[in-house]
């Protein structure tokens, strides 16, 4: 890169830690790694354990590249479109992992592990801000699993979008998330802002257990683990609870432009992304595609427009078919 390109990259980046040369090297790495992983899938197609591991690596790479592109300053309109690729990669991983485990509701994320928990909250939060139509699919990654309905922050983030969320007083990781739960539960705008400031102030030091912690110190032409430090869930809460973020919007880990984008752009409408279609048994299918009952992955089936939707005898209650994808 020449000096002009370097300066342009520095000005565009959303976080000052990102080295432009490292960014361009990592983009090349992820693209090459994608080719290598696809070849590994071909070579190991008969070994389900290996297929699961490879799809997990693919999903990690796609999400990390998405985050790195955000950190580098890519336009949100482009990232909004590409976020579906991240979700689809995790769906493929979940599909093969569930086959391997012999459990149709096996979770793609283990909330007891901080890396998994942070990443799941990131997917949910980014979707709230950019692609609310993808939230049912993201929830499908942990729906009906041992972690579904067990974490207060997850329930708070998803309750406006996913039915049958619970009011609970338990969570998997106390700090820093206690500050954010306090923010949600506070009675006044002033208290919420103070709690959010505490959350952002303390967020990074409690991420020490994550594999990417302090990765900005090891950026080089041969790679590294840094793709940005972002408290995505703080932005989601600020948006959902309409917080005035003037006093904390310039905090290093607060993705302020995502909140501004979400406030300026209405959610993608149902005609473009009809993920919110709901149909009862005996009613005609309004759109050809994949449907499932209550975000329960094992019920997923494909129906043709005009086909009568069936009743299923489930222990989860009434059958309500929800559109997933074309």
Across the structure, where does each feature detected by a protein language model lie?
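Extracellular/lumenal glycan-associated surfaces
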Residues: 286-298
